[in-house]
């Protein structure tokens, strides 16, 4: 019974993260997705692929706010410097900060790393029961990209719990 319940909770977490990856919500922060690493997402002056480019964003760039309703697949956005339009298929919403560090031994910490690898440089150490961790829409091989206390980095997902 416990295994069944744990499986359901795990699946809900996977589906919740997947749902956020496709969700675009006005007023919320989003990240750039579905762009090759050697390419850039164009922020355009108007909602058209033919409109002039006002800025370019890399895959994984976050801090992009959708400022209004999307129209015909195009969303008005701003990044703190410029305003423009992007196609919604290149945006994924950042999760609310609902996750906490768990399953870490008393007195131990969870390493926030630069890349999804246990060999990667440690950026910060997260204490047991530390909360307000937001999932960014990127995951790889059991690692989750997160934002916490002003840091962005990767943690092993098995040490996080939340909604």
What residues fall within each predicted segment?
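Bacterial N-terminal signal peptides
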Residues: 5-14
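Sec/Tat signal peptide C-region and signal peptidase I cleavage site
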Residues: 16-21
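Boundary regions of SH3-family modules and the immediately adjacent low-complexity/disordered segments
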Residues: 22-29, 55, 64, 78-102, ...
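A structural signal for short, hydrophobic beta-strand segments that form beta-sheets
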Residues: 26-37, 65-69, 101-106, 132-137
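Extracytoplasmic
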Residues: 28-29, 38, 72-74, 81, ...
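Fold-core signature of tandem repeat domains
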Residues: 35, 41-43, 57, 75-77, ...
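SH3/SH3-like (including bacterial SH3b) beta-barrel domains
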Residues: 45-68, 114-138
């Amino acid at each position: 019974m416990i295994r069944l319940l744990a499986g359901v909770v795990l699946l809900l977490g996977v589906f919740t993260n997947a749902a956020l990856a496709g969700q675009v919500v006005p007023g919320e922060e989003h990240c750039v997705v579905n762009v090759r690493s050697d390419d850039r997402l164009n922020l355009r002056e108007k909602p058209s692929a033919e409109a002039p480019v006002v800025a370019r964003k890399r895959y994984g760039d976050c801090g992009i706010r959708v400022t209004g309703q999307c129209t015909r697949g195009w969303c008005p956005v701003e990044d703190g410097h410029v305003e423009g339009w992007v196609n919604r298929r290149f945006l994924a919403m950042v999760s609310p900060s609902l996750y906490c560090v768990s399953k870490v031994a008393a007195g131990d910490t969870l390493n926030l790393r630069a890349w999804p690898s246990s060999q990667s440089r440690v950026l910060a150490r997260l204490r047991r029961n530390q909360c307000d961790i937001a999932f960014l829409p990127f995951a790889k091989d059991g690692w989750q990209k997160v934002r916490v206390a002003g840091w962005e980095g990767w943690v092993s997902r098995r040490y996080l719990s939340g909604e």
